[in-house]
Amino acid sequence: MSWQQFKHAWLIKFWAPIPAVIAAGILSTYYFGITGTFWAVTGEFTRWGGQLLQLFGVHAEEWGYFKIIHLEGSPLTRIDGMMILGMFGGCFAAALWANNVKLRMPRSRIRIMQAIIGGIIAGFGARLAMGCNLAAFFTGIPQFSLHAWFFAIATAIGSWFGARFTLLPIFRIPVKMQKVSAASPLTQKPDQARRRFRLGMLIFFGMLGWALLTAMNQPKLGLAMLFGVGFGLLIERAQICFTSAFRDMWITGRTHMAKAIIIGMAVSAIGIFSYVQLGVEPKIMWAGPNAVMGGLLFGFGIVLAGGCETGWMYRAVEGQVHYWWVGLGNVIGSTILAYYWDDFAPALATDWDKINLLKTFGPMGGLLVTYLLLFTALMLIIGWEKRFFRRAAPQTAKEIA
């Protein structure tokens, strides 16, 4: 394979979702084994909100929530912070390689309000459940934490309500029709594409250099950034978005991304299991009403906003300004949750047990239960897809006729 063939096939074209999500599952497994924590983003975004408040004299470090997730240090001294910086760098490099960066403004104020309000709801719900589509779902279920299953089911339900809500007439933006005499060909500016590809390579190797230099003195921080670059490349090139996995299932019947996510978790689970058997402590959270309520809010919020925590990150660096607002909403929502945490934490979270399936059913039993639940989820998704298109077929035939 020549360089030009490799460049076009792997650096410019989008990647197939299933192999990319499986790769993300494998990468997240090694990330857990090396750093001792799971792939997650909203906890760090919450710390950003807390530290912004500190700049204005607010003693956020005294809040109970920040005593749990720790507010010490800065993004440059925390594993999650370095990983997220790596993710942004990886996303941006991948977008530049494909010349997929263009400033795109929201078409209406309604979309901006959707982004901010949906982002706030999603951020609040994610931190209420102690995790977003990553820590309380994609990387939470392979940790064998029961709370992640509560969150996943609630998120699916919340996304159904979100899908129905966003189909209301108020969210329909008028489309401006323009008469044309012929289709406009899709074109790119070759010089611009070359410049951006080189800039993407500069950013990519710059991030790698930064990570390796950091790893010389602080191995976990440097490796966290390397993993972040990998995660960023995967989510941007494969356009991995958990919002579309849920929303598309309800609205269009498409389940390709949802099935990819299930398979990715199945691949990750056995790897996490092996690390746990070697003595690494899994990340188990409270299996209380917080997981259910947080999932409902998160599922509704991501569909209203149009993007989840990973989805808004790669779209933001592609120049889609709508997702800048979603990200801002996420930080605001998670910070609001941190402020009110002490008021309802005992009733909704901390008085409830942290249930580890590997301890409840034994190591092999917990692994088997997890795979049975994943298989059940996959069968339900396939069943829903068949039912959706079976019901849609008569209507489609009627419209064609």
Model-derived segments and spans:
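Membrane-interfacial helix-loop segments of redox and metal-homeostasis proteins
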Residues: 1-401
